Amino acid sequence: MLQLLLAVFIGGGTGSVARWLLSMRFNPLHQAIPLGTLAANLIGAFIIGMGFAWFSRMTNIDPVWKVLITTGFCGGLTTFSTFSAEVVFLLQEGRFGWALLNVFVNLLGSFAMTALAFWLFSASTVH
């Protein structure tokens, strides 16, 4: 149990730092769409789809790796709270179209990336 807790802790910290770095680098590039948050959510969705595909096929992987990557890293990397706050800020600024676009791209993009990764890595022969 302690190993699992440490895996979530380490993965979560690493994912959070990665999200912060993405936000620092890419959010300033566009006024209305926080590109760093979008990148974090899409990358995290892809990684979790890939992880679920691999872990469902490779049952001999230590559960520590599963929680490190999915619950830890992807949980720290992706962020519904930051995404929600950014949408609220756009709404407060009266940028309703941008807020709606942000919701649309984050949600559908994340679903699409998870499905794509699951499909790609379920079909692969990597063991």
UniProtKB/Swiss-Prot annotation:
Major location (coarse): membrane
Pfam families: CRCB (PF02537)
GO cellular component, one term: plasma membrane
Keyword Membrane: yes
Membrane spanning residue stretches: 4-24, 35-55, 71-91, 103-123
GO biological processes: cellular detoxification of fluoride
Localization annotation: Cell inner membrane
Membrane topology: Multi-pass membrane protein
A GO MF term: metal ion binding
Binding site for Na(+): 75, 78
Keywords: Cell inner membrane, Cell membrane, Ion channel, Ion transport, Membrane, Metal-binding, Sodium, Transmembrane, Transmembrane helix, Transport
Reaction catalyzed: fluoride(in) = fluoride(out)
Source organism, top-level taxon: Bacteria
Mechanisms controlling activity: Na(+) is not transported, but it plays an essential structural role and its presence is essential for fluoride channel function.
Its job: Fluoride-specific ion channel. Important for reducing fluoride concentration in the cell, thus reducing its toxicity.
Family as reported in the entry's similarity comment: Belongs to the fluoride channel Fluc/FEX (TC 1.A.43) family.
Name of the protein: Fluoride-specific ion channel FluC
Organismal lineage: Bacteria, Pseudomonadati, Pseudomonadota, Gammaproteobacteria, Enterobacterales
